[in-house]
């Protein structure tokens, strides 16, 4: 009798799982068709945004395009949040989970010439971080999900953020009452990365290394030459794992290297300390030693000031020492919720080609993302979406002079993440 009960339970469970799997597949197939139907219009939007890039806190034209597009879809729209921020609210036909999706809108100052035919018309400004693509993908997701309204349970919030490049936009929107307007249970977002177009990368916890500047204050009458030499020796002794030969770009170029990069289990980017520079400065009557570095381990980040202070107090400079502290952060790393990362990965894998979902095993250096400020309020996951196409000569490494994105990435982004949001909104 017990065996029969177990077999019956297994059959019922299998049936439920298969039904859910079939539902996921059906929804995704419908989303694929809807995305295909709007793809050419999305490419036009992306190219228009690329031709007319706007710097941080100047995204008026972009935010107007976004707001008009969302209104035409029938969404409730809020504007001028934290500056040029826009929020679109899509309410489903039934009650369910509330899911937020965030995209950034600003461009970057650069004198490097554009590498695409639809070149920037704003001199010295380009979208070389892919925010034009991020914005377009988010609009595409909003379009597709508005067509799925009868299948949507819960509410989806679309956050279009200004000033990501200055690391102020998220904080500005939050300070201006963003979370009074929206009440998400989960939040998601993405950034274009150097993998092949459509490849999704994700990992739990930190995506990037922590970028910190340590400031040590000394009395003014200290022997500056000896002090700088002493402090340089301390911080150089902290360096580990990654070779310091070459420029930062030499290290960054290894990120997508299949042998040592982030998608390899034996990646060199798992555990490291990279010293970006250390120097002595004098301000008024005080002497400061400033050291900037990248560190993967938050415990090490927290313990370093105490370790360095101990070495100073054990040295001949102990009587000159005044204080040690971290300077204000202008960068940081998203901190992906482990449980949501697992669930989101499994959900995407249920309808997306398996080889297109590649886990990460390390933390990228030299990058920052203010998406982390949303994650301090709501559990969430931040993804990388590959945009490169080697055969076409397209390399989507952010902030590089030849940055470009294969526009099929827009289609992949809309399809996969619209399906993810739908499944998460409808989840119990």
Segments from the language model and where they lie:
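Midchain, well-structured core segments that form catalytic/ion-binding scaffolds
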Residues: 184-313, 322-333
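Active-site-adjacent substrate-binding region
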Residues: 236-270, 331-387
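Sec-dependent N-terminal signal peptides
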Residues: 6-14
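Divalent metal-coordination and catalytic microenvironments
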Residues: 49, 70, 88, 101, ...
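Acidic/histidine-rich catalytic neighborhood of metal-dependent amide-processing enzymes
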Residues: 133-206
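Positively charged n-region of N-terminal signal peptides that target proteins for export
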Residues: 1-5
């Amino acid at each position: 009798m017990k065996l029969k009960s177990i077999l019956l339970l297994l059959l019922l469970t299998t049936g439920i799982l298969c039904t859910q799997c079939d539902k996921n597949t059906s929804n995704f197939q419908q989303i694929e068709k809807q995305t295909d139907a709007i793809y050419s219009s999305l490419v036009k939007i992306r190219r228009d945004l690329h031709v007319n890039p706007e710097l941080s806190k100047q995204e008026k034209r972009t935010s107007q395009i976004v707001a008009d597009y969302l209104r035409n879809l029938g969404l409730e729209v809020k504007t001028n949040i934290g500056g040029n921020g826009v929020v679109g609210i899509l309410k489903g036909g039934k009650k369910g989970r509330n899911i937020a999706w965030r995209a950034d809108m600003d461009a970057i100052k650069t004198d490097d010439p554009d590498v695409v035919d639809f070149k920037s018309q704003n001199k010295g400004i380009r979208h070389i971080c892919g925010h034009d693509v991020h914005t377009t993908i988010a609009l595409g997701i909003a379009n597709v999900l508005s067509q799925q309204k009868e299948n949507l349970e819960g509410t989806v919030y679309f956050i279009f953020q200004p000033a990501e490049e200055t690391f102020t936009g998220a904080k500005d929107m939050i300070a201006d009452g963003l979370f009074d307007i929206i009440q998400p249970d989960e939040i998601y977002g993405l950034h274009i990365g150097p993998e092949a177009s459509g490849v999704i990368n994700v990992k739990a916890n930190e995506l990037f290394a922590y970028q910190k500047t340590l400031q040590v204050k000394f009395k003014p009458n200290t022997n500056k030459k000896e002090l700088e030499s002493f402090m340089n020796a301390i911080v150089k002794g902290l360096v580990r794992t990654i070779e310091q030969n070459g420029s930062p770009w030499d290290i960054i170029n290894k990120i997508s290297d299949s042998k040592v990069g982030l998608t390899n289990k034996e990646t060199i980017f798992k555990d490291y300390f990279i010293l970006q520079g250390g120097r002595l400065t004098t301000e008024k009557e005080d002497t400061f030693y400033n050291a900037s570095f990248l560190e993967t381990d938050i415990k090490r980040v927290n313990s370093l000031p105490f370790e360095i202070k101990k070495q100073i107090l054990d040295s001949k400079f102990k009587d000159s020492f005044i204080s040690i502290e971290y300077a204000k952060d202008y960068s940081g790393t998203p901190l992906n919720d482990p449980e949501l990362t697992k669930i989101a990965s499994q959900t995407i894998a249920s309808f997306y080609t398996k080889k297109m979902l590649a886990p990460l095993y390390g933390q990228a250096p030299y990058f920052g993302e203010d998406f982390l400020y949303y994650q301090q309020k709501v559990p969430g996951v931040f993804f990388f979406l590959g945009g490169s196409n080697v055969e076409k000569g397209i390399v989507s490494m952010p902030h590089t002079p030849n940055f470009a994105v294969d526009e099929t990435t827009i289609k992949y982004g809309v399809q996969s993440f619209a399906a993810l949001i739908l499944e998460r909104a409808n989840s119990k």
